[in-house]
Amino acid sequence: MRISGLLLMVLALGHLLVMHLMGTGAERINFGFVAVRWASPFWRTWDWMLLMLALVHGINGLRNITLDYVQRPGLRLTINMLSYVIGFTLMVLGTIIVVTFDPSKWPGAV
């Protein structure tokens, strides 16, 4: 988790710098901006890695909180399994969106 945490920090700070601090800031972010940005495999990979690492980091944090505060083994297992299922579902949906995003299928949006 330490290495992924460091990588997550680099990705998140890079995201904040590029998306919110450079240029005119967050006002420029719209569908067209994302479409142009995601035309590059570099930015798709960057955003996908940011999403995956954030989800893994968050799910691991929930697991640690559950292990610390939930005493009943059955409830602990239920909460952890629910967290894993939700996290996996979000990972699959996020991957589908990043991989299949095509602005040409949104007429009039760009």
Model-derived features: where do they sit?
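Membrane-embedded alpha-helical bundles that constitute the cytochrome b-like, heme-associated redox core
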Residues: 1-110
